[in-house]
């Protein structure tokens, strides 16, 4: 069994360099919620050094709230903003002799695109316009995954080690109790259940079916590095190969 392990990087966390030795894919902030040209360049350099797959992590234009504010923007605006961000990272990656492999939206752009078909379509269209060979990463079973498939993109369905799930397979909003899993044992058990058995227990007790092709580790979590090491060790024990 193989699984991709990804982390959101270039967002100002001190643990980026170490996380890049533990993950197989990096989603690099492109300036709209965090990061800038220098951090993008530094993250790309480290990712190439560690053999980690490079991806763009575009966001709504919301540095003030770290891309976590809901926005209702015209699809053409979202298309242009997404293309702008992924194009910038693609150029920075190419300039350093690397290849950009995937795109994963950030924060509220990701969450809204999971449910809003027009928004999902604008993102998928931007990815396709930039490079049809790019992989589109989205919440398992979401509108974003369906939009990517409509454009003929390779999609990668994502699950979260440290997030609570609702009965419909969507994430519990960060504003609600149960959104974040702080207990390491619980996060580890949830991850293995999703990867090995394709299901996750919701905060209300029901099982939701999920397709786990990539697992997200949040690099900004307090125990991110320790948990990443433990997850890698557990995967190795279970014969699960970590690779993009």
From Swiss-Prot:
CDD domains: LamB_YcsF_YbgL_like
Matching Pfam families: LamB_YcsF
Keywords annotated in UniProt: ATP-binding, Hydrolase, Nucleotide-binding
One Gene Ontology molecular-function label: ATP binding
GO biological process, one term: carbohydrate metabolic process
InterPro entries recorded: Glyco_hydro/deAcase_b/a-brl (IPR011330), LamB/YcsF/PxpA-like (IPR005501)
Top-level taxon in the UniProt lineage: Bacteria
Catalytic activity: 5-oxo-L-proline + ATP + 2 H2O = L-glutamate + ADP + phosphate + H(+)
E.C. designation(s): 3.5.2.9
Similarity annotation: Belongs to the LamB/PxpA family.
NCBIfam families to which the protein is assigned, alphabetical: PRK05406.1-1 (NF003812), PRK05406.1-3 (NF003814), PRK05406.1-4 (NF003815), PRK05406.1-5 (NF003816)
Role description: Catalyzes the cleavage of 5-oxoproline to form L-glutamate coupled to the hydrolysis of ATP to ADP and inorganic phosphate.
PANTHER family linked: 5-OXOPROLINASE SUBUNIT A, UNCHARACTERIZED PROTEIN YBGL-RELATED
Oligomer status and interactors: Forms a complex composed of PxpA, PxpB and PxpC.
Protein's name in the database: 5-oxoprolinase subunit A
Organism encoding this protein: Escherichia coli O6:H1 (strain CFT073 / ATCC 700928 / UPEC)
Phylogenetic placement of the source organism: Bacteria, Pseudomonadati, Pseudomonadota, Gammaproteobacteria, Enterobacterales
